[in-house]
A protein has these predicted regions:
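Residues forming the flavin
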Residues: 1-225
C-alpha cells in the first residue's frame, strides 16, 4: 500500500529463518491448491523489488531507536549489527484472533501452538459452548477474508436448520459444497504458518520491551507483577 501510494519503505526486515523456510517446504504440495494466494504473495514481493525496497530475511535483535519519538531501527543481519534511520517504523509479528467478545461472555478457549495464540473452542459449524452463540471469521481463527465468508455461510446454514427453516438433507448438501470451498481456501495456511512463524524475540521479549503502549507497560513490569 505504501509503495502504491508513492512512498515505499526503505527496507523490509523479516525474522523468518532458513529453517522456517525448509520446514514449510513439506507443505508446498498442499499449498498448490491455494495457488492464487501464492501468486499474489510472489507478485507483492516482485512489486517491492521493482520499487527498490531492500528485503532482509533472517534478522534478529530488532529494536527501535529514539526516546520521545522513533529515530531508527537497529537489528542484526547475517551476523552484523546494522541500523536504519527512520521516523516511521511498522511492526508486525503475525495475526491473532480477536477474542475479547468471546471471552467476555465466558466462551472456552484453547491454545494454538502453531500460531501461538488462544482461540475459541468451536465445533465444525462455528458454535461454541455458550448456547446459540456462533463464532466465525477472525474471532474464531486466522484463515483470510474468503475463508471467513465461507465459515459465515456454514454457520448460517446451521442456524437455519436449528430454527427449522431447512431440512437435515439440505443442511448436509449445502454444507458439503461450502466445506469443499473452505478446504481450498485453507490449503495454503500450513505453508504460510510454518514459513512465517512468530519470532522468538516477540514471544519472549526482554524486560524493556513495551507490551502496552497505551499504559506504557513493559514486559519487565508484567514479570514483576
Amino acid at each position: 500500500q505504501l509503495t502504491r501510494a508513492g512512498t515505499p519503505p526503505i527496507a523490509l526486515l523479516e525474522t523468518q529463518t532458513r529453517s522456517d523456510f525448509l520446514v514449510s517446504l513439506r507443505h508446498v504440495v498442499g499449498a498448490l491448491r491455494g495457488w492464487r494466494y501464492l501468486v499474489k504473495g510472489l507478485s507483492m514481493l516482485s512489486e517491492l523489488r521493482r520499487a527498490g525496497v531492500k528485503r532482509n530475511v533472517g534478522v534478529t535483535d530488532v529494536s527501535i531507536s529514539g526516546v520521545e519519538f522513533a529515530t531508527g531501527v537497529r537489528f542484526k543481519y547475517r551476523g552484523r549489527s546494522r541500523e536504519l534511520n527512520s521516523d516511521a517504523i511498522l511492526l508486525h509479528h503475525g495475526v491473532v484472533p480477536n477474542t475479547q467478545i468471546a471471552r467476555s461472555i465466558g466462551v472456552s478457549h484453547k491454545w494454538n501452538e502453531q500460531g501461538h495464540y488462544f482461540s475459541a473452542v468451536i465445533d465444525v459449524w462455528g458454535e461454541c459452548d455458550q448456547a446459540g452463540v456462533f463464532i466465525v471469521g477472525d474471532s474464531a481463527g486466522i484463515g483470510g477474508a474468503q475463508a471467513a465468508a465461507v465459515n459465515g455461510r456454514i454457520a448460517a446454514l446451521r442456524v437455519l436448520y436449528k430454527a427449522g427453516r431447512i431440512s437435515e438433507n439440505i443442511l448436509a448438501d449445502k454444507a458439503s459444497v461450502l466445506r469443499a470451498q473452505l478446504r481450498k481456501e485453507m490449503a495454503v495456511r500450513p505453508f504460510l504458518d510454518s514459513a512465517y512463524p512468530p519470532a522468538l524475540q516477540a514471544l519472549m521479549p526482554i524486560d524493556s520491551t513495551v507490551v502496552c503502549r497505551c499504559e506504557e507497560v513493559t514486559a519487565g513490569d508484567i514479570r514483576g507483577y
